[in-house]
A protein has these predicted regions:
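Short secondary-structure boundary segments
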Residues: 17, 64, 85-87, 107-108, ...
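Histidine/lysine/aspartate-rich catalytic loop segments that bind and position anionic ligands
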Residues: 82, 86-114
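Alpha-helix-loop-beta-strand connector modules within alpha/beta enzyme cores
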Residues: 26-45, 71-88, 116-144, 178-179
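Conserved beta-strand positions in the central sheet of alpha/beta enzyme cores
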Residues: 12-14, 44, 61, 82, ...
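Catalytic domains of carbohydrate-active enzymes, especially glycoside hydrolases
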Residues: 3-16, 98
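Catalytic cores of alpha/beta
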Residues: 4, 43-58, 72, 87-99, ...
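N-terminal active-site wall of soluble small-molecule enzyme domains
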Residues: 12-75
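Glycine-rich phosphate-binding active-site loops on the catalytic face of alpha/beta enzymes
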Residues: 62-72, 104-116, 147-179
């Protein structure tokens, strides 16, 4: 993680600890937060505004089955809140109305990180970009061979997981260096 963040190519790090106890989430979260802070990387907690508050993380990412954004704002106040919109312009409009700080769309490509029920297209990114200045995040199966098209089609940020952390061909540092 240190070497990857040291490259300066990571603006946000999302911590996903679905199968851990709260105690372990806090222990791991504190260590990750310190590393992120050292490299000016914002720490985003997946699905859990309570953990976001406990860790005083920079923000929280909410899926469609997580706590409502308005409830999350009561818990974490002015922290960053991003919303998964899958491939839906309707969900994006709701998130925009509720003042989400970013909108995440995907999966754009097959992914091993989680079971993707939805496939997003660059058409969705282009359509939503006309509706808002809210940053758009592309997620799902992104790698060194397919990322440029997403950036050309209005994605402000890329959420990349398996390509960096579970790559059979490249170590994390090698993988991230291939994303220019």
């Amino acid at each position: 993680l240190l070497l990857v963040l040291k490259t300066g190519k990571v603006s946000f790090f999302q911590l996903r600890l679905k199968k851990y106890s709260l105690k372990n989430k806090i222990l791991i979260g504190k260590k990750i937060k310190r590393i992120c802070k050292n490299y000016n990387v914002k720490l985003i907690i997946n699905d859990d505004p309570f953990l976001t508050k406990i860790l005083n993380a920079d923000g929280c990412h909410l899926g469609q089955n997580d706590i409502n954004i308005l409830e999350a704002k009561k818990i974490i106040k002015n922290k960053i809140i991003g919303i998964t919109c899958h491939n839906s312009i309707r969900l994006a409009r709701i998130a925009i109305k509720n003042k989400a700080d970013y909108l995440a769309f995907g999966a754009f490509f097959p992914t091993r990180t989680k079971n993707a029920k939805y496939t997003a297209t660059t058409k969705v990114l282009n359509t939503v970009k006309k509706l808002t200045k809210t940053p758009l995040i592309a997620i799902g199966g992104i790698n060194n061979l397919n990322y440029k098209n997403l950036l050309l089609n209005k994605a402000n940020f890329l959420a990349i997981s398996s390509y960096i952390w579970n790559n059979k061909k490249y170590k994390p540092l090698e993988a991230i260096k291939k994303i220019r």
